[in-house]
Structures are given as C-alpha cells and as structure tokens.
Amino acid sequence: MILDKIKKPNDIHKIPLAEFPQLAEEIRSFLIESVSRTGGHLASNLGVVELTLALHNVLDFPDDKLIWDVGHQAYTHKILTGRKGEFETLRKEGGLSGFPKRGESNCDSFDAGHSSDSISAGLGYVHARDLLGENYHVVSVIGDGALTGGMAYEALNNAAELETNFIIVLNDNNMSISPNVGGMSNYLSAIRTAEAYTGMKMSLNKAVKKIPRVGTAMVDAVRRTKSSIKQLFIPGMLFENMGLTYLGPVDGHNMRQMMRLFNEAKRVKGPVVVHVLTEKGRGYEPARQNPDMFHGIGPFDIKTGKPTQKKVCPGYTDVFADALCQVAAEEEKLVAITAAMPDGTGLKKFSQRFPDRFFDVGIAEEHAVSFAAGLALGGVVPVVAIYSSFLQRAVDQMLHDVCMQKLHVIFAVDRAGLVGADGETHQGNFDISYLSMMPGMTVMAPKNDWELKEMLRFAVKADGPVAIRYPRGNAYQGLQEYQTAVEMGKSEVLHSGCKVAVLALGSMVEICAEVCSELQKEGIDSTFVNVRFVKPLDTALLDQLARNHSLVVTVEENVQNGGFGQQVCGYMEEHHPGIQVLPVAIPDRFVPHGGVDSLRVQLGLSANAIAEKIKKISSSYSEGIRE
C-alpha cells in the first residue's frame, strides 16, 4: 500500500503525483474502517482528503503552519504527519485527540475545537513571523459554516492591511455555487488564477500607485469598474472588496488543480483566499447521504452505516426536545434559537413543528444571545439552546444585553459537565461559574428526565433570565418517586439524616445516591439533598442543616473556582463558621478526552472516591459523626 510509505512528516514529498489518487482512496478506506470502530468525525474528514494531500504537497512541516478551524477535519493531516498507528486510540483516554493538539505533534500549529478563530490565529502567526524576520508559510483552513461567525470577518477585515503572504483556504462543502453561474465562474476563475494574470495584476497595481497624486485613485477606479461586472458572476468579490486576493473556486477533489492554486497563492504578497469546493462524506455513501449524522458518530456498521451501540433510554437532549415542543404547543409566544446546531441541541424537531418560531442564526453565539434579548423586549419568550462550552463565547452578551436589562430569556445549556471523547475544548465545566456571577440570573440543574421537563415549564413562567444546565448522554430515570414541585430557590431533600449532609447538583445526584448508600453501610446516616438551584442559593436549607450537621459536602460537575461549593463555603463561613464544608468539584485544570466514568475516577468525582473522602473526614472527628 502507498499509505504504508507515510511514516513521518513530509514523507508525502517522496510519493509520485501519479500515485496521489490511489493514496487518497487508501486514506478514505482507512478512515472509514478506523472510525467505524472508535467513533469520531467522519463526514467532514472524508471531504478533505484531497485538500489535505494537496496542502501537504506544497508545504513543509513543521516549519510551515497549518491551522484548522474547529479542527475536527484534521484526521488526514494527522495521518500524513506520522500518527496513523495511533488511530485505534482516537478520542480514548491517553490516546489520539480528535482535534489538533500542539502537545501531540509539532506539526499541529494551534489547538482547535471551537469555530471561526483560525484566521485570527493565522494572522497572529504571520505578524510574529514578519516581526522576527522568519520565513515560513501560514495557511488557515476555514469552512463555509465557520464563516457565519462574526469573528472570522473581524479577522478578514484586519488581514486586509497585510502586505506579506497569508493563505486562507475556504473549504466550501455546501456546494453553494449555483449551476447557472458555474460556467462563467469557472471561466473567470481560470483567467484570474493563471500565473501571468496574478503577477501582472500585482505589478500593474504597484506601478500605477507610484504615479504622483492620481495613482491610488486610478487603481481604485479600475477596481470599482471591473468589480461592477465581476460581482454578477464571482462570489469572491466579497473578499476582493475587503482587500484580499481571491482565487477559485476550484474542485476540492482535483489535487493537481489545487496544487497549482496553492503554489500560486504562495506567490501573492498579501492575504489570499483560495476557494475550494468539497463534498462531505465523499467515498462512503451513508455519510454522503447523511452528513449530519456522520458529523460526529459513535462506532457503526460499515455495511449499513448504522450505529452499533443502541440507545437504552432517551438522552437529556431528547427529553428537552420533546418537552420544548409540548410547552410550545401551549405557549404561542415561545420561540427557539440555535447557533447552527439544530440536531445537536434537539431543536430539529421544534423546527419541523414550529418553523415560524425557530431561528438558526449560524455559528454566532454572541449574536444569538443579543438577538434573544431583542425578541424578549418585543414580547416573546426566547429559548436559546447552546452547548455549555459554546455558550461561554457569549458571556458579555448574557451579562450586558440580557441580565442588565432583566430580560426573560431561557438558556438551555446542553452538554454541561463532562462530555468525554471531545476533550478540553468541549467539556462543559465552567458554566456554573460564569452564570452564577451574573446578577439576576437563575441557574438550575435537574436530577433526572422528569425534573428537566418541570424546570423548563418553571422557566417559561419565571421572570428574568433563567439557565437550565443538563449533561450529555442518557437521561437518568431513577428517583422517580421524588416529584415535588419546582419552587424558586428551593432544594429537594431526598433523605433526612444527621451530622453529614450531601448536597448534589444535577448529574451528580445519580452518583451521590450511591455515595449515601455506601455511607449508610458504614453507619453514617447522611442527609441527601437534590440542590436543584445553584442560584438563588437555598440559604434557608443551609441554615437548617447548620443546626444538626457538622459536615456539609457539595458535589458538582463544574470547576471548583466560582462553583456551587464555593458559594456554600462563603455563606457558611459568614453565617455558620463552625460547620465544615467539603466542596467536591473539578480541579483547576483542563480535562482531556476520555470516557466520562474514567474521568470521574481521575477527578475524584466517582461514587467510591466521594464516599472515601467523607469517611476519612468523619473518622477524624474526635467525637465521631457515626451513629
């Protein structure tokens, strides 16, 4: 196999161009086989095989810098830089990350995971290169979806002032060029991408600008005249008008054409956008037909394309989706907003039932929140469904546009807590901290599927901003015998004991049910509390616990700094200084990829680890807290 010849970075330079098509097919076969066993992002990676091969053919690693926006499409890049043998460990604890990681390879130039930042990072590299007098190429690869994020345009606007080379590859996998203008676009593209044309254009502009007083004006006038015609045919005029050179569009599966274009782009003295048309899922029919399903998928059967792991029960996202539709049927003023993730957040079902009340704003979390603020002021009830790790991109908008105005906006914070395989960039470990600091924000977390539905109904009737955080994965269906009404700022006591109180939040209620059972075996009859509300804090309950408890244990799947436990510590220190508080939370560090259960063991959040901590403290009391 040709693929077996790739052992380390730049080995691709030894492969004859005639063998590249076969190499592309071998890489596709390898990706399908490998991801079918481990799970991962498949459709996007199948779409960029030729694009990645073409880039590696014209670049040298690790000297040149290749920055992937989001980064989930970098599997072929990992293969070509000598990591093929590690793919059996993809997204597993201690194994290969599903995203570029600088700590994994010096060929990964930027740790990725979130959207629309690649051009900014690339521009930073370019300025650092020029300031230090170094000589290497910088390439940022960004998808058409990521271009819906405003940060990308901020960077493009800033890059327009550059006078040195910076290559931006627009990976367009939506095939947005209409057939009726495709012929003209390709014709004009062929003219504009010829070496003679680009060289002549740069030289002519430079020469004309030297004409005293009128040079720059002449160049601007010519640009305006030709743009009035070209804008009718070429989508790239958006970039040209911003001051960037535009090359393309080019077939993203024709490697020779792309190599010619990339080599031409390397000659441009300034920022250049190379527009590449690719097809998601190429080479595997199930992924090509259903790219959304194969965006991120678990292990699957190659023949059928269907997951090999069946759902045992509905996930929290499914429960939220059904509950939202039920509430929307009763509340005509309720609307739903997503930032380009209707499937991931469960809003696809809502969009089908209530299309006029559904808004997909693109990858633009900041806009989504301010947009929701306007909707709330206009008299409707917006529900903003966003992953925890992505919502943090809109902290200022939540604080300034929503909380400051005390607006009734509901935040459905999906993937809160540990998410597992996607690692540091996707763990939802910070939302309690950043949401709790906002004046007027109500923050809730359900213990099970029933409580999520009830909290959503409560949020719709509440005043001001409300956030409901819930985890990834199957919805906990235990403790159904406890179904007390949700009241503002009130916890739910599941068992009354003495001496030790365990206050569990959201997903940790399931874990702490085991903890309390284990403590009972050791003679420790602990009070077990389903916290429900992070904010407002249930101070009445804390006052009550202080009367007959020596130890209060808080358990949450959030970083300790700024978390629920610290809030309880602060209150108890001020009002009940004699009570010891043990906050159990995620330490002050980023959590890598791995299985959620395994990560909990590492972080001291497993039932056994929590029980051991409590037993250790209990045995240290001279008078004891055992019965």
Task: Say what each PLM segment does.
Residues 3, 174-320:
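Long, well-ordered, tryptophan-enriched scaffold segments
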Residues 41-162, 316, 333-334, 338-339, ...:
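Cofactor-binding active-site loop characterized by glycine-rich and histidine/acidic residues
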Residues 65, 270, 278-391, 397-407, ...:
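Non-catalytic terminal/interface segments that mediate subunit docking, oligomerization
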Residues 86-96, 161-175, 196-199, 403-415:
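A glycine-rich helix N-cap at a beta->alpha junction
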Residues 218-286, 408-413, 432-481, 607-627:
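Structural signature of the thiamine diphosphate
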Residues 260-263, 295-296, 305, 315-330, ...:
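Glycine-/acidic-rich phosphate or pyrophosphate-binding loops and their flanking alpha/beta elements
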Residues 299-303, 307-312, 420-422, 442, ...:
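Peripheral docking tails and interdomain loops at the edges
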